[in-house]
């Protein structure tokens, strides 16, 4: 049976070109892995609550096996809320994959959060 995927595309600044580029990248990745794309969410700005509810409902009803997005920032929410979304999807049989960050799991997310944390002191930036 062919695996099913949902693509989650988001442009923070509302750029249609960025959305199309992301959609093409994700579609190519799904095709290369022989996944059937069952739904594409395309959003600008902050990820909407309705999209998150749709994802949860689809996961609960086992309508897809993979959620694919460009990177972790696609969720556009605080780390604890993002972790809860990933946890819920995994518990319902969905593997969360990103092109830039790999597979997301509840175990890998804390490291991902720490790697993105930056400290600013005066005009100098520390990673």
Descriptions of predicted regions:
Residues 1-127:
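Short, structured surface patches at the beginning of a domain
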């Amino acid at each position: 049976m062919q695996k099913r995927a949902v693509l989650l595309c988001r442009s923070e600044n509302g750029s249609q070109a960025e959305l199309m580029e992301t959609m093409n990248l994700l579609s190519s990745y799904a095709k290369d892995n022989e996944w059937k794309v069952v739904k594409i969410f395309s959003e600008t700005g902050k990820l909407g609550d309705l999209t998150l509810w749709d994802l949860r409902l689809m996961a609960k009803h086992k309508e897809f096996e993979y959620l694919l997005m460009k990177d972790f920032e696609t969720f556009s929410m605080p780390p604890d809320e993002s972790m809860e979304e990933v946890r819920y999807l995994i518990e319902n049989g969905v593997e969360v994959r990103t092109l830039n960050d790999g597979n997301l799991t509840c175990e890998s997310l804390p490291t991902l959060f720490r790697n993105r944390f930056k400290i600013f002191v005066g005009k100098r930036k520390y990673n």
